[in-house]
Curated annotation (Swiss-Prot):
InterPro entries: Smg
Protein name: Protein Smg
Pfam families assigned to the protein according to its UniProt record, in alphabetical order: DUF494
Entry coiled-coil feature ranges: none
Organism, scientific name: Pectobacterium atrosepticum (strain SCRI 1043 / ATCC BAA-672)
Protein family membership: Belongs to the Smg family.
């Protein structure tokens, strides 16, 4: 499923390719590219739920909190997001690339992935996908892109 999301993001979304394709055509294209239908349907469902969150139809579970409060992760979240991933999310919050809402969207979308293995590189792509699709986060997306693609040394690589 994550491979399908990456392919879609790199091939269509990130490259600003016109994406006015119906789901059946897209599914056929992805099948021809070598992806399994179950993974395709899971990825499309994941993207639909991301769109629902952005449109306010569904909200991740979070409450308004003190901006200085520390996020406590559930046991399942800690299993999926190792210390390096959690540290990177905190780093992005401190750099004001992420805010409470976008952080929670990212965590919710990470937890919705059907994968057993998840690392920092995967998290970076999920962050890009979420920020790309959230209205008003264009600057945060651009900052994240710069962190990922233009920095050769240091913590973020």
């Amino acid at each position: 499923m994550f491979d399908v999301l990456m392919y879609l993001f790199e091939s269509y979304i990130h490259n600003e390719t016109e994406m006015r394709v119906d789901q059946d055509t897209l599914t056929d294209d992805l099948t021809r590219a070598g992806f399994h239908r179950n993974d395709i349907y899971s990825a499309l469902s994941w993207l639909e739920k991301l769109a629902d969150i952005q449109e306010g139809q569904t909200a991740p579970l979070y409450l308004a909190s003190d901006p200085l409060a520390m996020r406590i992760y559930t046991q399942d979240e800690e299993l999926r997001l190792d210390a390096e991933c959690r540290g990177f999310l905190l780093f992005l919050e401190q750099m004001q690339v992420l805010n409470l809402e976008t952080r929670e969207m990212i965590i919710e979308r990470v937890m919705a992935l059907e994968t057993q293995e998840f690392d920092l590189e995967d998290l970076k792509w999920v962050i890009l996908m979420v920020l790309f699709n959230v209205p008003g986060c264009e600057n945060a997306y651009q900052q994240m892109e710069e962190l990922l693609f233009e920095v050769n040394d240091g913590y973020v690589q």
